[in-house]
């Protein structure tokens, strides 16, 4: 059920950011004030931070400041500023700055790129620590169109001032998600799909491309669980096309799924 909620959130997120793109922001947390002013002529954002009324930071951003939050990742822990940026457009791109104000300096501790998916903060395992949950959009447009692309689960934690991938800690969620991916895959297999005639033939917008993008997401989920060989066993079983070896090489070398 959890991944259904994540997918639902991503759909809502995409609609929301497009509706709010270009809006100005003026947010205050304690003695720190954040202002974001979007210039429609230059298509850029002037991002200003003031502490006790004194300007301590200003930068022109090519992205729109979608949201500014102050969050604790652990109960009673340190509070950080989360700056959610969005580039605009139907399918791209969302990113996150995790920052703090130290003295009179605005310091970006780490950043995350979420592409088309967006992200949400949620305590997935109910242990009191919030995770950053997203769909990994690394396969967007890689094998077929955006609508057919699958977004495998990605979970990060913020620890020691760094965003750390901990997707593999959520094996139950990954298995649950794999069930949906495999259901979609079996439907395509049942209907049948035409293989490319040559190993360099483009499979974009074809059924073979759809099979590739689903298999890629399955391999990614198995990779997160430390069982990537199971994903490739399924590729060998299902995708018997002339470009299979090239496809596997792309997954291993370009996407580092090995």
Region spans (language model):
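Residue-level signature of beta-propeller blades and closely related beta-rich strand-turn architectures
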Residues: 85-87, 138
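Acidic, glycine-anchored loop motifs typical of Ca2+
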Residues: 29, 73-82, 123-133
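Surface-exposed loop/turn elements that mediate protein-protein interactions on large endomembrane-trafficking
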Residues: 46-61, 97-113, 154-167
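N-terminal targeting signals for Sec/Tat export/insertion, comprising classic cleavable signal peptides
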Residues: 26-57
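Structural motif
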Residues: 43-46, 89-97, 141-154
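Sec-dependent N-terminal signal peptides
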Residues: 4-14
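Repeat-based blade/solenoid architectures
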Residues: 59-68, 112-120
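Acidic, small-residue rich beta-repeat scaffolds with periodic aromatic anchors
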Residues: 19-33, 37, 135-258
């Amino acid at each position: 059920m959890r991944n259904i909620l994540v997918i639902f959130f991503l759909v809502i997120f995409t609609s929301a950011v497009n509706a709010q793109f270009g809006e100005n922001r003026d947010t205050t947390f304690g003695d720190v004030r954040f202002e974001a002013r979007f210039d429609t002529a230059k298509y850029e954002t002037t991002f200003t931070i003031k502490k006790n009324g004194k300007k301590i930071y200003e930068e022109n951003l090519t992205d729109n400041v979608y949201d500014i939050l102050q969050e604790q990742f652990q109960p009673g822990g340190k509070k950080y500023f989360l700056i959610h940026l969005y580039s605009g457009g139907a399918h791209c791109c969302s990113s996150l700055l995790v920052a703090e104000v130290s003295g009179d300096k605005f310091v970006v501790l780490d950043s995350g790129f979420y592409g088309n998916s967006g992200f949400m903060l949620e305590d997935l395992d109910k242990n009191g620590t919030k995770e950053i949950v997203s769909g990994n959009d690394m396969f967007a447009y890689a094998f077929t169109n955006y609508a057919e692309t699958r977004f495998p689960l990605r979970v990060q934690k913020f620890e020691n001032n760094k965003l750390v991938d901990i997707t593999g800690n959520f094996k139950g969620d990954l298995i649950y998600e794999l069930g949906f991916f495999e259901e979609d895959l079996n439907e395509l297999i049942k209907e049948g799909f035409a293989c490319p005639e040559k190993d360099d033939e483009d499979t974009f917008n074809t059924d073979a491309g759809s099979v590739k993008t689903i298999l890629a997401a399955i391999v990614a989920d198995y990779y997160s669980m430390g069982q990537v060989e199971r994903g490739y066993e399924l590729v060998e079983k299902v995708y018997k096309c002339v470009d299979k070896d090239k496809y596997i090489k792309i997954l291993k070398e370009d996407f580092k799924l090995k």
